[in-house]
Structures are given as structure tokens and as C-alpha cells.
Amino acid sequence: MEGGEEEVERIPDELFDTKKKHLLDKLIRVGIILVLLIWGTVLLLKSIPHHSNTPDYQEPNSNYTNDGKLKVSFSVVRNNTFQPKYHELQWISDNKIESNDLGLYVTFMNDSYVVKSVYDDSYNSVLLEGKTFIHNGQNLTVESITASPDLKRLLIRTNSVQNWRHSTFGSYFVYDKSSSSFEEIGNEVALAIWSPNSNDIAYVQDNNIYIYSAISKKTIRAVTNDGSSFLFNGKPDWVYEEEVFEDDKAAWWSPTGDYLAFLKIDESEVGEFIIPYYVQDEKDIYPEMRSIKYPKSGTPNPHAELWVYSMKDGTSFHPRISGNKKDGSLLITEVTWVGNGNVLVKTTDRSSDILTVFLIDTIAKTSNVVRNESSNGGWWEITHNTLFIPANETFDRPHNGYVDILPIGGYNHLAYFENSNSSHYKTLTEGKWEVVNGPLAFDSMENRLYFISTRKSSTERHVYYIDLRSPNEIIEVTDTSEDGVYDVSFSSGRRFGLLTYKGPKVPYQKIVDFHSRKAEKCDKGNVLGKSLYHLEKNEVLTKILEDYAVPRKSFRELNLGKDEFGKDILVNSYEILPNDFDETLSDHYPVFFFAYGGPNSQQVVKTFSVGFNEVVASQLNAIVVVVDGRGTGFKGQDFRSLVRDRLGDYEARDQISAASLYGSLTFVDPQKISLFGWSYGGYLTLKTLEKDGGRHFKYGMSVAPVTDWRFYDSVYTERYMHTPQENFDGYVESSVHNVTALAQANRFLLMHGTGDDNVHFQNSLKFLDLLDLNGVENYDVHVFPDSDHSIRYHNANVIVFDKLLDWAKRAFDGQFVK
């Protein structure tokens, strides 16, 4: 319109008389106004969506699908609308009741801690009334309880303070049921565990071990006195807690309570990492500096020793443990009592190439190597499921033995070592499937060994058992005719179990009597044993789901082409299609890949969940894809071990191949393919963008990533990469180093917490420096002050997911296109 006005103003005045000129001026002004109105109306009409007359029309940003159901949103996910309820039973751990198992457990009901029986609903024994008690004038809250095996006393923790991921300090008390009295053990106690005979409690305070007598109601002896800020007794240091035990316990009672085995961990030679905290106290003008002993790849590990303490004579002895250690470092990965006087100890060298198993005789005070095994190109994964099998002549078990998990035919299977002092074993299971974690439980009355495996599918978990006398005669416990992921916990005598169905449908829990001869093939879930009752049906969740259009997962095995040997690359995957998906649309849907991809991990498993991926599918109208590429677990040793010494290579290739497949689909917009990952997934996101160079993945979102494996802890990293000294080139290639390739993507996002004690913020800072040095600018950064690896401090968890969703929306809207 501006150009039109200029033309009018240049008309020569002499062609008009004054009146005509004034009239023409008025007409021109009116005309201009009319043109402006018409032009504005056209623009307005163009901005309004064209409504169809069909009743199922919805606005593009509607909260409803075409069939009138609600879409999944962050608000309902965050308030746990779709979170199934699960219950844990604290089974009474008393071996004396094995032959008369009533399924006793401790629970909180009717404002009391009580002992109940799954077999006899009328059984009710009150242990403690209420969740508070008064001690020395203070009103204290019960935060956790552990009943003594004889049910006469309770071990209570209060004033809990979180330490690292698995560890907590607290004040511990013993409640005596007969006298209704509370006796304090101590404050700032790191660990407290009942002896199996209910007489004593071993506890750790100031990194020393003490014995508290429940009978005399006092601490009667100190087991150690050399504990310090760098010497840990009975309690793991940071790396043993995080990577070895995944627990806060490094002390183990013998079955009768006569001995206590424990680790003495010396981290004096371990390098120190300082983490600054900026917003802990608003009054602070200087950061609070916290120190952590953190062994990085190729640097000294903590030195661990096994000690055994005798309750009878009050002495400790240190059995000699040595093995094939290339550099003098030894990891003690598992300690298991195999009888009252013998301890089985698993060790590996620091790179997990050699497994050495020792048998310690606590009476003779000797140690012998009973197994010495190579990983044969893979690695020894740390496990904690070695299961003691007691001698029983009736069932042809003349010696104490144990069941362990071993690679048999390239897959993880059960092996029965009939004599704990021998390396000879009986193969219990075999085939192209895997036992998950290890043996689950042993029913000595029935000679049954229970386990969970992928026998039906690597994306499912079903419960089975075998009789030790009949190897490979596998009996199904759960119904394999239906897809399912199951778990089970057993009562002391293994007669009863809490069977938990985790998906893919709505989860439930029920109590099963596995000694019942009635096989309930018509019953939902189990085909063995009698279902007594449901502990949880999640009926409220089932009702809620009727109102929502939850995008469904579709599981499949993707063929990503041929590997270097000409074999098909078959990987597990699932996709989530958006609501009202229309495959006839062309170049329409963005694809949001979510990846983790760490060695021996698994994301593609048929559990029930409604979370961030479903929000993305619903709110961004995107296809969500998850691919478990090579290196991940439960598809055999060859599939997972080829990533050894070259992390980030095959994993990234497989994500790229999957993106190429999806980009070729007619309904996918190949310019809108993104990848998101956290932790190892954050690392994999950056490595994939680096290797892809913008060909398939146009966007990436990386949260708390490792960017250089020299910066991560030694125990995890060296298991898959060896040391930097042994594998220098591998560490260079596995780092995120070719940052100019990331510049070929449209844009990427980096987020990290500054207080991350696991994947240090150092990783992101070093990466950002590389970007600066190479002039790479196509990225965004968000830093979360003082947040650890979970990114939760000061509302950070809300922000991190809001940011991810908003950033992905902007990417798919084309706001980052160069």
C-alpha cells in the first residue's frame, strides 16, 4: 500500500482545478482505508484454520484426540497420574521357619507396624504402634525399620541424611517389644545389620565397625579402630558404592552369626575431585567446596582387603587374596557365605578380564583359588547373585555348593558348582537366551531353583524353575503365552511369593502359594501354584486410562543391514506413534529418538510406563523411537562385547542406521529427526551427531554426558575400555572430539548439573571449550546449579524436562533451520 500512495502524490496539480483536487483527495483517502481493510481481512482469514463441518475436528494444539479422549501431558505425568502402585513385603528372614513357612512379613497398617501372614489372614502381631516415639524428650519419626529374625526387636532409623546415591546416615535405635523400650545405638551411623541369630547388630560409625548386643542393650566391642576419612571398614567408598556393590553395605554375617566378613577399603592413593556448590546457602559469598575421592580411568583405585571377625574369640584375620592382576589392582566384587565357616570371594583385575574366585576357610584360616577364568574377548560383568546351595543327601547334594551365572555357548546361563571347593560345575540352563542377573531363589524343600530369563523373548521377563537333579528341564512359572515382564520375591521358606507383573498391560501384584499342586492355567499370570489373593490390581489406574489416549508402544526387531562379516544386524526397538496418526500424509511427522545404549543395558523391554516419551508423542505429534543397538544386553555375548575398547562406535552407527530407515518412510519429515539421551545416552547423542555429520540427525539433546572417558570413573570405564595407558587410541576415538562434524547438524542442546558427582561437569566444560576453539556455535546450553546427576535441585527436574520439550518443539517448528 505504501507504493500506491507515492504514485498518487506525484500526479501533476495543473491537470485539476481546486475543487476537483479536494474531492479527489477525499476519494483517495477513503480508497486507501478500504484497501487497508480488505488487505487486513484477507490476512485475518488466512490466519484462521479452515474448519471442516465434521464433528471430530480439533484445534492443532488441542488437548483432545479426534475421538474425544485426553492427550497425555506433562501435568498429569508429573502428578503420578499414570504411576502404578507397587508394594514391597519385608519378609521375615528366619531360616528356622523354612519347613513351616507361614509367609510372615512386616508391614505398616492401622497406624502400627505389624507382622502378618500371607497364609493366615487372621495372624496379626503388633510390633510397634505409631510412626513416632519420644527419646530424651525428643519426638522422633520412624523412617525405616528392620525386624530381628526372631521378631522380638526392631532396628529403627531416624534423622536420616542422604550421602551418595545408595548411602544414608542416621540415628539408630533398638526397640524391645517385651519391655516397650527404645535404646539408642548411635548418631551418624552409616550402616546397621542384624545378625541371623537376632543377638547382635553390626554397625558402622566414623568408618569403624562396632557390635551392639541386643541382649545386654549396649555396644560390647569395637571390631576395628583404624577407620578414617580415607579408610572405610564395612562401608564402601564412593566408587565401590556406585560401581561395585550399588549398595551401602560392605559387611556380611555368616548364616549362624558366628562370623562377620567385611571389607577394609583404603582410598588414600585415590585422586581427589573438588565439587563447588554455589547455592546451598544464600548467605554464602564463596562456593562451598566438597571433596570426593574419585578414581578416574588409569589412576590409582582404592585398595580393598577382606577381613573376617570371629564373635567367639573377638579376633579378626586377613585371608590372603591374590590373583592374575596386570597392574597390582584388585577389585573384590562379591562376598558370599557358603556355609557357616566358608566364604566365597569373587575378584577381578581392574579391567575385568580375569575372574578369580577364592574360598576362605574361617576355621582353618586359609584361602584357596577355586576358579580362575578369562573373559575371552568380553568382560566379567559385576553381579551379586551367587546363591548358596546347602548339602542335602536326600536330594543328592553331598556337599555345600553354589549356583553362579556363566557365559555358556555365548549366553549367560546357570551353572551349579556342586562342591564349593571345586571348579567343576553342572550346566543347568543353555540356549540362545539369557538368565537375567542370576539365580533368584532356592527352595530346599522342593529342590527347586527359581530364575528369571529371556527364554521367550529378549524383551520379556518370565519366571521359571528347574530341579537341580534335572538340568535343562525348565518349568514355566508365569504364563508365556502372553507377553509379560515379571518379578517375584519369596518368603523365607520359598513357599510363598509376591508375584509382580510389570507390563505391558496395567501392572498387578498377587500372592502365590508355589507349593500348591494346583496348576492354575486359567489364572492370569502364573501357571504354577495357587493364587491366594491380589495385593494390588491398580484398578484406579485402569479407570483413569479409559479417559486418555495413551500412545501405544509397538515392539519390533529392526534389521539395520549387514555387518562387516555379512551378518544381519538385528536390534530390538519400539516406536510410539502420535495420536490420530495418518500414514497417508507425506513428509509430515518428526521423529524423536530416545537413546541410552550403555554396555549390557536395555531400554526396549515390555514394561508398562507412561512418561516423557508419551508426552513427546502426544504434545509434539512426533514418532518416538527407541533402539537398543549393539553393545546392549540380553542378546548374547557377541552382540554386546564387540564394543570393547571402542565405546561410541557401533552404538552410534546403529542409531544412524535406524534414523536412515525412518527417514525413508513417506510419512516422515527427514529434516526433523532428533536424538535425546541422558548420561550414557547423552554421550551417545553427541557421538551420533559427530559420526552422522548432519546427514540424518538434524537435532540432538544431550543431558549430563560423558565426553571423554578419561574423566569417568575407573571401575566402570576400564571394564569396557581397559586403561588409557593400554588403549590410548581407543580413548581418543571414543571421546567426542570431531566437533566440527556437530556443526553440520541444525542445532543441539547441552544440559548438565554443576554438582554432578557421577559424570562431572568437567565433561561438559571441556566439550564447550572444544566448541569454542573450533568456532562451533549451533548449540544451546543450560546449566543447573548444584544439581547432581539426576538434576533435581531447586526445581531443576521440572525445568530440565520443560526445556527438552520446548526445545524439541522449536526444532520441529523449524526455528533452528540454518
UniProtKB/Swiss-Prot annotation:
GO cellular component entries: fungal-type vacuole membrane; plasma membrane
Lumenal side: 46-818
Transmembrane segments: 30-45
Primary localization: membrane
Taxonomic superkingdom: Eukaryota
GO biological process: protein processing; proteolysis
Residue positions the entry lists as glycosylated: N63, N79, N110, N139, N372, N392, N421, N738
Active site residues according to the UniProt entry: S679 (charge relay system), D756 (charge relay system), H789 (charge relay system)
Key word ATP-binding present: no
EC number(s) given by UniProt: 3.4.14.-
Protein's name in the database: Dipeptidyl aminopeptidase B
Organism in which the protein naturally occurs: Saccharomyces cerevisiae (strain ATCC 204508 / S288c) (Baker's yeast)
